[in-house]
From Swiss-Prot:
GO biological process: platelet aggregation; protein maturation; proteolysis; regulation of translation
Its job: Cotranslationally removes the N-terminal methionine from nascent proteins. The N-terminal methionine is often cleaved when the second residue in the primary sequence is small and uncharged (Met-Ala-, Cys, Gly, Pro, Ser, Thr, or Val). Required for normal progression through the cell cycle.
Binding-site residues for Zn(2+) 2, renumbered to this chain: C22, C25, H48, H52
Protein species of origin: Homo sapiens
Sites where the protein binds Zn(2+) 1: C9, C14, C36, C40
Reaction catalyzed: Release of N-terminal amino acids, preferentially methionine, from peptides and arylamides
Binding sites annotated in the UniProt record for Zn(2+) 3: D220, D231, E358
Similarity annotation: Belongs to the peptidase M24A family. Methionine aminopeptidase type 1 subfamily.
Record protein name field: Methionine aminopeptidase 1
Zn finger residue spans: C6H2-type: 6-59
Subunit text: Associates with the 60S ribosomal subunit of the 80S translational complex.
Record PTM N-acetylalanine, positions in chain: A2
Top-level lineage group: Eukaryota
Organism placement in taxonomy: Eukaryota, Metazoa, Chordata, Craniata, Vertebrata
Cofactor(s) needed by this chain: Zn(2+); Co(2+); Mn(2+); Fe(2+)
Amino acid sequence: MAAVETRVCETDGCSSEAKLQCPTCIKLGIQGSYFCSQECFKGSWATHKLLHKKAKDEKAKREVSSWTVEGDINTDPWAGYRYTGKLRPHYPLMPTRPVPSYIQRPDYADHPLGMSESEQALKGTSQIKLLSSEDIEGMRLVCRLAREVLDVAAGMIKPGVTTEEIDHAVHLACIARNCYPSPLNYYNFPKSCCTSVNEVICHGIPDRRPLQEGDIVNVDITLYRNGYHGDLNETFFVGEVDDGARKLVQTTYECLMQAIDAVKPGVRYRELGNIIQKHAQANGFSVVRSYCGHGIHKLFHTAPNVPHYAKNKAVGVMKSGHVFTIEPMICEGGWQDETWPDGWTAVTRDGKRSAQFEHTLLVTDTGCEILTRRLDSARPHFMSQF
């Protein structure tokens, strides 16, 4: 606590002279908050800390209030590229959004190539980290916050809203929770979340295309807080969708949950792909092979590797204390994919739709804990859109 000129204590019911100011208020530039003692400061903390959140929100809004994009929208930025489906990018993208300096950042956040040196140091290893009780609490917190941010995005899904607007809201929601949006600058990814529409399998870059009636869109959120990452995604309906979209999204969610039901100590990671592919194929769908679930904790992506297709060669056996994601990508047509010239947007080669759901899971002694579960409902958002 820093000593300042005499003021009156801000604690309700206390009129003592106050010479102590909250250090966080000083850092954020909040004026007029003084306390007479550490006891009054601690006693007022539950209400006083709300000033910090308000100040951070206002600062973030000021930082983005002047952002504009001028000029016409370009829906064909890569001359000669043959798109696999009807979706087109809408360029130019908005400028990269800044993250305030008071937010803790992962090691890749300011790297010119977005490289994570901590991940690179462990590249190729199959050793799976057993999380300590402290690690687990860190993961529970960041996963709960990631869920809150995805729920913010879910409330925006409707025709006419752009994925750029969703990304903007996600960015601000991360900052309001003292979190860094993990995708931002990860190997130079330019946005704070991934938004994958229709034939986009994953890693779609938010842009100025308005969502259209009948679209399906996946929003993939990862937050970084206190040294830990929390990761989840859901696929949503945009307005009224056809029966094919409903079946695809429902089946994809069922694939995820059937795999989660199998998670417990002693199960081989390779077994999850058998479960997922069996259910997908039974419903006439295919499973993407190029992208997998992964270990996650202090590293965004690490061991284990968790393929979603059958007869895979994944290494490792589940143990209590492992944390990883399951995130099956299920397609209407073939599983083959290709990548747009932006280097990120993965699309189905045949242009047919793809859906995805993801949870971060903690293996427990008897099964698993879904760290990114909804706290207000056991249902994913799309079930409320029927």
